[in-house]
Amino acid sequence: MMLEQDTGLSLAIAQIVQRLKGSSLHSQLERQARGSWEKRILKSLNSMCTELSIPLARKRPIGEQKELLNKWNEMGTDEPDLSLFRPVYAPKDFLEVLMNLRNPNYENGDQPSFRNHLGLIQVPLKVKDIPELKDSFSELGLNTGQLGIDDSTQVPPELFENEHVRVGQTVLTEQDSAAAQQYVRQGCPTALRAELWALILNISNQPEDILYYEQLKSNVIQHDLLVDSLIYKDVKLTASNDDYYFVFEDYLYQVLLCFSRDTSVLEHFSYNSATPPKSYIRGKLGMEEYAVFYPPNGVIPFHGFSMYVAPLCFLYHEPSKLYQIFREMYVRFFFRLHSISSHPSGIVSLCLLFETLLQTHLPQLFYHLREIGAQPLRISFKWMVRAFSGYLATDQLLLLWDRILGYNSLEILAVLAAAVFAFRAVNLMEVTSLAAAEAVLADLSTLKVMPLLQIFLFATVT
């Protein structure tokens, strides 16, 4: 069984788009870039399949099924030989693709103002400026109470927190999802976060949900997929080496292996610009009646993918509920961080927003780093593509993700990335190489998210 892209269809689309040149510039760009990128991912997966002589999928022998079932809750103790497996791609590979995005219509002069953009992203998408961001994130203002701010001048922190907890309990009692979303814009009390997030995401963990999770688990037990080894490898390379998350290794395997089998995830491709990859029964290449999506959820994991799940393990200890929360977070938010699109929360827009904020409000720093070959996006991209998971301390990361849920937007990731550069600007102005700049920004674990965001948006920038 081999993966194959439907090149005939892609070519037809490209030809149609060319004839409509000018009518949908961003769509044209997205389709061409996506087609090329998806083809590259499939080629990487196919090459691994061929080199290792491993099928994309196989049914496990009964003995192997029993063994996996017995060790389901302690898969972290398993040490399979993964030395020959490699991630299909890493964030830096994806950044190279985004850097090469071009729109010839704009390069011919349609939008001369964009020529002043000296960053790595050369796609003229509309992104918000500071006044618009202030308006969008008004609840982060200096005069608004926030969890994660220790020295509010308006209300003593303990008084705000006590009242905030009381309001949060009322929101939970009323089971009002919209009220919960508004509430978490000021941060979630630790004791209420799990329930509030579940309310916002409409996760109730009913018996049928638990049964569905068990069915996915059964599918994992019965069938072995090539992507299972990619998941194992990713967990071993990332979460297993993280001081915060290594204890959740078993949870990560369970959730991610089940996720790969979940065909309901395919539904998000109706609003995700990407195309789920297909495999064909051997000898039936290109015959649609013999095609299936591979993996079944249509999502090929990349290096760092498991870090989307890891922070959630602090909040949810019931595997089926943890699974549902992650799946909903993925189809609402995380897929946008590794998909090429012009959506305001898509990774291309986030990169452009980050670069625009730095170039506009910290021009000296931006130009200095650019001149020494340390384009800021080369450093910040990995933070944004993982939603800062694995970079911030967990308590700070959860405060950040509160706001992602509250504002139903990932734009705050770009704002925080710019705020980090602003915070370390003095040290960064002294560096003379990319390696030195990376060293200055190597450890974000001591940073306090909310003060950084407030200062950047509402205090130092006008």
Role assignments for model-derived ranges:
Residues 5, 9-12, 21, 25, ...:
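Alpha-helical interaction elements in eukaryotic regulators
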Residues 16-19, 71, 97, 117, ...:
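Alpha-helical recognition domains of nuclear gene-regulatory proteins
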Residues 32-33, 62, 85, 115, ...:
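Short amphipathic alpha-helical segments embedded in low-complexity Lys/Glu-rich regions
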Residues 130, 139-160, 166, 171-174, ...:
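Extended, Lys/Glu/Leu-rich amphipathic alpha-helical scaffolds
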